[in-house]
From Swiss-Prot:
The active site is at D49 (charge relay system), H86 (charge relay system), S250 (charge relay system). InterPro entries: Peptidase_S8/S53_dom (IPR000209), Peptidase_S8/S53_dom_sf (IPR036852), Peptidase_S8/S53_subtilisin (IPR051048), Peptidase_S8_Asp-AS (IPR023827), Peptidase_S8_His-AS (IPR022398), Peptidase_S8_Ser-AS (IPR023828), Peptidase_S8_subtilisin-rel (IPR015500), Subtilisin_Carlsberg-like (IPR034202). The keyword Protease applies. Keywords: Hydrolase, Protease, Serine protease. The lineage of its organism: Bacteria, Bacillati, Bacillota, Bacilli, Bacillales. The keyword Protease applies. Residues 22-311 form the Peptidase S8 domain. One of its GO terms (molecular function) is serine-type endopeptidase activity. Pfam families: Peptidase_S8 (PF00082). This is Intracellular alkaline protease. Belongs to the peptidase S8 family. PANTHER family: CELL WALL-ASSOCIATED PROTEASE, SUBTILISIN-RELATED. Its EC number is 3.4.21.-.
Length: 321
């Protein structure tokens, strides 16, 4: 039976209280597009991970539901509490609410649906992950709401037809699948390290850089990397209503998931229609800044949400002269 695990990560620090917009949220320029994107309101992101502390003060108002697909808690589906910490951290980066204290996520008015597909020890069966993806796609809220985005900071070393089919099912139903690229890198650009599902072409695979936009030595490098985001020293929500600073591509991926919620709203306003998953990916690529590394390292570049508006503004000013 094939096992999938959390993408390995490093815990740097743990604190009981914070009050800030995390640096990662700032440098991807999320605040620059919050007004135009309604801070992600109306979008639902499925977080497939170790669960979540549902009563965390920064997350409680953003979590609209969840399910447990593991054998933890006796397999009770309604108990999707986090018994690891990883899932709570990921959820906070995606959409921690603006409460006046604590931290703020990339899309602070987007909603979260928690899918516990990893046990407290960070492992999960491949079937749980595939089922979680299909569950997210098929879920409907009381008013017909649907998830448009799935984020997964997990992976395994081997390809799986069942898992790949689940990913393709999601994308064919206009659900974007965001995955951490993996932390098995050797610091070299000319070697490939793959983790699945991030290695599937249909997935948005996310690598990691630090706050100075320097590549870390831990991320996987390969030709399937799509974009990079902050993944070193990321502060977010954690167990016991606290906060932690973690590092890894696990921390980079949720920046992109939150960004997609903002981009979907921006695109709908700009195009006056709902864009397909492929079109949304194209809009994401438009907001990637080249940072001087090979495509194996950084894909299309660094996530820069305010890039399009900044360029548009420059041309608008030129046109007025």
């Amino acid at each position: 039976m094939r096992k999938f695990r959390l993408i390995p990560y490093k815990q740097v620090d743990k604190v009981s209280a914070l009050s800030e917009v995390p640096m990662g949220v700032e440098i991807v320029e999320a605040p620059a597009v919050w007004k135009a994107s309604a801070k992600g309101a109306g979008q639902i992101i499925g977080v497939i991970d170790t669960g979540c502390q549902v009563d965390h003060p920064d997350l409680a108002e953003r979590i609209i539901g969840g399910v447990n697909l593991t054998t933890d808690y006796g397999g009770v589906e309604t108990n999707f509490s986090d018994n690891n910490g990883h899932g709570t951290h990921v959820a906070g980066t995606v959409a921690a609410a603006e409460t006046g204290s604590g931290v703020v996520g990339v899309a602070p008015k987007a909603d979260l649906f928690i899918i516990k597909a990893l046990s407290g020890d960070g492992s999960g069966e491949m079937g749980w992950i595939a089922k979680a993806i299909r569950y997210a796609v098929d879920w409907r809220g009381p008013k017909g709401e649907q998830m448009r985005i799935i984020t997964m900071s997990l992976g395994g070393p081997t390809d799986s037809e069942e898992l790949h089919d689940a990913v393709k099912y999601a994308v064919s139903n206009n659900v974007s699948v965001v995955c951490a690229a993996g932390n098995e890198g050797d610091g070299r650009e000319d070697t490939n390290e793959f983790a699945y599902p991030a290695a599937y072409n249909e997935v948005i695979a996310v690598g990691a850089v630090d706050f100075d936009l320097r590549l870390s030595d831990f991320p996987n490098t390969n030709e399937e990397i799509d974009i990079v985001a902050p993944g070193v020293g990321i502060k977010s929500t954690y167990l016991d209503s606290g906060y932690a600073e973690l590092s890894g591509t696990s921390m980079a991926a949720p920046h992109v998931a939150g960004a997609l919620a903002l981009i979907i709203n921006l695109a709908k306003d700009a195009f006056k229609r709902t864009l397909s998953e492929t079109e949304i990916c194209a809009q994401l690529v438009r907001r990637a800044t080249p940072i001087g590394f090979t495509a194996q390292d950084k894909g299309n570049g660094f996530l820069t949400l305010g890039l399009v508006e900044r360029i548009t503004g420059q041309f608008t000013e030129k046109g007025k002269k």
